């Protein structure tokens, strides 16, 4: 069998069609496949003529009429996106300095923002009621939180051992020895720091407690006068004039999972009969060449299998500006004005057609809503860690989400995905300028979702949480270390966002959102400092002689005190604030039925195990978050390169590398406290022993085998596992199917496989006009690539080749026409483990 015969056999043609092709040489095959009989001055350009034929034979059901077009040079191009109709989307510069704004106002240079006159008087009057109610509620929350914090802080002050606060007079210490003065002041300085940190942390815990409590009451009553979901009955026909884009920004994601969830979502939309109102946009920022090719292939298969021609689009950006927010902005500039709304999906998002249609109905019923955020439920993971987190978010999450809605109403959160956005105001007001200055807190905004919600609200549009709308799902990280990688990004992003706290026009609620975003991570170093100061105070108490007399003519000594009964009472009160929301959550399930959670005893046992698990993980997260916060402030780059693994489990080596310092700190802390005062070790035991056990908990909780065992025992069971919704059943089915036909080593297949090469050539975006300089550059790229082994061809050079239709055609021709000359490429390709199902194309995979 010669090379030409081998090439013909690799084509997805019938035996009769293969027999009709010439067997003389590769060029003749491409000329025979070219229905237009084009001639090329260069022999290695001949594959460009057969692109259309190779595509049509490989994916006959994926190509809509008119989707294959000609570029300016007459080359076949697969039009993966609709025609762009550009909109202007530009950001207002951030004015973060109130002093500078005041000075500009004095000089008559104050700039009136674009958002000032958005609402008419009639619109303001129609919304005044819920805004007034929201303001009153938030004042009540503030009073409750501060009152509770003041009482607890005063109580904390009374149980500290050194009570000579009133006797300290700095003037009396002027003439005495510096060391004596320092030793007199040291316990009180430590206690002052402890009190300040306690007040801040208790206030943070108190706010969460009142949020969960109000959420519990909302869900228990079952009626919410101000719920945005109450504005529709749920079966109104959608307005055909208002079309919705489902956009999914992705970047080097699991291709099988992305397209499985997307297919299940789209089929659910079709089942509602509302598919004509929606289009899908896959917006790729992937820069791994193998994943890029796999995405293109998966897109073609998806279109064929759901008949999505002309409604499901794919685009890969060559210039990845501003990450996810820049990807969404690019969509809005090019295609946004073709749609009234857009729903942003994450790579792991799954949404039912009823949920998506419901979000559109809510938008149409509330013309002043800018963003409506659904409440996604976590599901789909099998590791012990993920199942425990799924259970926690499913049981406790509804309380906190309903509580957030109770306090915030139409001035709420946006979490960046599983939400519907009104496109026009988003384009006009939500473009993000880079933060001014230099350093780690300047430049492109990382956590864009909170900022976009704040800008939407600043422009007068409502931001709502539809906390009671079912059908929205997501996945959680499979293990602790993967969650911490995500937290590292979120930590930096939330710290950056706090620079916008004083920006002009921001609503007070969204200033509070910026503050709570910071506290989500800043609370970790504050808690660590609180523990460190408490330990230092115990060291001072144990190793130094107390200063009984703090004034020169003091008549009675000040005795250090230890009142364990009061300390236990305060500790118990704090634990109530921390754990009562969990108890309220389980009580709500007890009231409404425990069957979907495994029954009364199993859900109760699951709750107790989750509490134990959260106690073990809290100190570990505290130390990691402390490192993230300190690194962000110091401008350090936290490098976190995990080894490649075949499943979600954490290897023992990586666990000890990540948690080794925590284990050592826990051991030193425990031994030191046991030597000083065994009673104090009792108070620190949940902290230090959690740190000592951290590597073991991290590894064991990452195992799918352990998680699946708890699933068989019906522990950590959630309703989505007990009675899976159809959209999740379909996601699992399509995920299994996609993994059977997964395409690995996509770039090499795009060079060698005729069908995938035609797809890569047709979808390449670097379509320049012909020029001598360009031809020289193309020849250089191709020659340099082929003269090296494929293993030495780095990612960036592969991307350059993949982006140019001419270079891909020439690579394809040369490796097939002269396999002896390019034996390193041929041998490497033949050494790959090929998945036959991945190379069968639409003609076989659809059967």
Swiss-Prot record:
GO BP annotations of the record are: glucan biosynthetic process
List locations, semicolon-separated. Answer: Cell inner membrane
Q: Which residues lie on this side of the membrane: Periplasmic?
A: 157-193, 535-567, 626-679
Keywords, sorted A to Z: Cell inner membrane, Cell membrane, Glycosyltransferase, Membrane, Transferase, Transmembrane, Transmembrane helix
Report how it sits in the membrane: Multi-pass membrane protein
Q: Which InterPro entries match?
A: Glucans_biosynth_gluTrFase_H, Glyco_trans_2-like, Glycosyltr_2/OpgH_subfam, Nucleotide-diphossugar_trans
Q: Which residues lie on this side of the membrane: Cytoplasmic?
A: 1-138, 217-511, 591-602, 703-847
Show the stretches that span the lipid bilayer. Answer: 139-156, 194-216, 512-534, 568-590, 603-625, 680-702
Q: The organism sits in which domain of life?
A: Bacteria
Entry-linked NCBIfam families: PRK05454.1-1 (NF003955), PRK05454.2-1 (NF003958), PRK05454.2-5 (NF003962)
Name of this chain's protein = Glucans biosynthesis glucosyltransferase H
- Report the gene name: mdoH
């Amino acid at each position: 069998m010669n090379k030409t015969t081998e090439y013909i056999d690799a084509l997805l043609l019938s035996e009769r069609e293969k027999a009709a092709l010439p067997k003389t040489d590769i060029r003749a095959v491409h000329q025979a496949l070219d229905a237009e009989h084009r001639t090329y001055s260069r022999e290695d350009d001949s594959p460009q003529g057969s692109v259309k034929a190779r595509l049509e034979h490989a994916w006959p059901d994926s190509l809509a009429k008119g989707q294959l077009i000609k570029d300016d040079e007459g080359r076949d191009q697969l039009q993966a996106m609709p025609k762009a109709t550009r909109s202007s989307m530009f950001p207002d510069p951030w004015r973060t300095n109130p002093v500078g704004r005041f000075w500009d106002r004095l000089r008559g240079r104050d700039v009136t923002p674009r958002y000032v006159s958005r609402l008419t008087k009639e619109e303001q009057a129609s919304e005044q009621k819920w805004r007034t109610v929201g303001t009153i509620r938030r004042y009540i929350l503030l009073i409750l939180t501060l009152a509770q914090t003041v009482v607890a802080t005063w109580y904390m002050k009374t149980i500290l051992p050194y009570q000579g606060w009133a006797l300290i007079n700095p003037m009396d210490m002027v003439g005495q020895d510096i060391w004596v003065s320092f030793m007199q002041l040291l316990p009180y300085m430590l206690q002052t720091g402890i009190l300040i940190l306690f007040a801040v942390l208790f206030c943070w815990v108190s706010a969460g407690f009142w949020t969960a409590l109000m959420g519990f009451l909302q869900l228990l009553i079952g009626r919410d006068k101000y719920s945005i979901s109450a504005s529709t009955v749920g079966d109104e026909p959608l307005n055909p004039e208002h079309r919705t884009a489902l956009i999914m920004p992705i970047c080097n994601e699991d291709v099988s999972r992305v397209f499985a969830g997307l297919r299940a979502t789209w089929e659910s939309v079709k089942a509602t009969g509302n598919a004509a109102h929606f289009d899908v946009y896959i917006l790729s920022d992937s820069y791994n060449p193998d994943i890029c090719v796999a995405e293109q292939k998966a897109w073609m298969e998806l279109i064929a299998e759901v008949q999505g021609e002309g409604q499901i689009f794919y685009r890969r950006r060559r210039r990845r500006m501003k990450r996810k927010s820049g990807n969404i902005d690019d969509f809005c500039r090019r295609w946004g004005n073709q749609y009234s709304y857009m729903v942003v999906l994450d790579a792991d998002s799954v949404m039912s057609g009823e949920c998506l249609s419901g979000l559109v109905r809510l938008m149409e019923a509330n013309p002043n809503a800018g963003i409506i955020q659904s409440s996604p439920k976590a599901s789909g993971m099998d590791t012990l860690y993920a199942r425990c987190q799924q259970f926690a978010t499913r049981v406790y999450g509804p309380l906190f989400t309903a509580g957030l809605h109770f306090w915030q109403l139409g001035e709420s959160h946006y979490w960046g995905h599983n939400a519907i956005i009104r496109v026009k105001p988003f384009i006009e007001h939500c473009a993000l300028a880079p933060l001014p200055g230099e350093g780690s807190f300047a430049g492109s905004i990382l956590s864009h979702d909170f900022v976009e919600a704040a800008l939407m609200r600043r422009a007068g549009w409502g931001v709502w949480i539809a906390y009671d709308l079912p059908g929205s799902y997501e996945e959680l990280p499979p293990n602790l270390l993967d969650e911490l990688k995500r937290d590292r990004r979120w930590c930096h992003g939330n710290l950056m966002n706090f620079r916008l706290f004083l920006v002009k026009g921001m609503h007070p609620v969204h200033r509070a959102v910026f503050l709570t975003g910071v506290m989500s991570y800043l609370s970790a170093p504050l808690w660590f400092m609180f523990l460190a100061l408490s330990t230092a105070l115990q060291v001072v108490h144990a190793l130094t002689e107390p200063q009984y007399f703090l004034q020169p003519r003091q008549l009675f000594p000040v005795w250090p005190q230890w009142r364990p009964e009061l300390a236990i009472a305060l500790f118990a009160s704090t634990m109530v604030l921390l754990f009562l929301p969990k108890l309220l959550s389980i009580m709500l399930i007890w009231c409404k039925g425990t069957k979907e959670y495994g029954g009364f005893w199993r859900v109760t046992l699951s709750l107790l195990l989750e509490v134990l698990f959260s106690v073990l993980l809290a100190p570990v997260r505290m130390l990691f978050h402390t490192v993230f916060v300190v690194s962000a402030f110091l401008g350090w780059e936290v490098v976190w390169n995990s080894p490649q693994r075949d499943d979600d489990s954490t290897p023992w080596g990586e666990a000890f590398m990540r948690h080794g310092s925590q284990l050592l700190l826990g051991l030193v802390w425990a031994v030191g406290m046991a030597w000083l005062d065994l009673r104090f070790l009792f108070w620190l035991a949940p902290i230090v022993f959690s740190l000592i056990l951290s590597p073991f908990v991290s590894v064991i909780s990452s195992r799918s085998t352990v998680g699946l065992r708890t699933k068989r025992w019906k522990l950590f069971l959630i309703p989505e596992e007990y009675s899976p919704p159809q959209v999740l059943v379909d996601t699992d089915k399509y995920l299994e199917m996609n993994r059977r036909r997964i395409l690995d080593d996509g770039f090499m297949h795009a060079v060698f496989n005729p069908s995938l090469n035609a797809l890569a050539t047709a979808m390449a975006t670097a379509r320049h006009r012909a020029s001598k300089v360009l031809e020289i550059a193309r020849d250089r790229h191709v020659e340099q690539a082929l003269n090296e082994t494929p293993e030495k061809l780095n990612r960036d050079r592969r991307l350059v080749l993949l982006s140019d239709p001419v270079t891909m055609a020439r690579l394809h021709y040369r490796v097939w026409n002269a396999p002896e000359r390019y034996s390193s490429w041929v041998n490497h390709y033949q050494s790959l483990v090929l998945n036959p199902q991945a190379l069968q194309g639409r003609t076989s995979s659809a059967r």
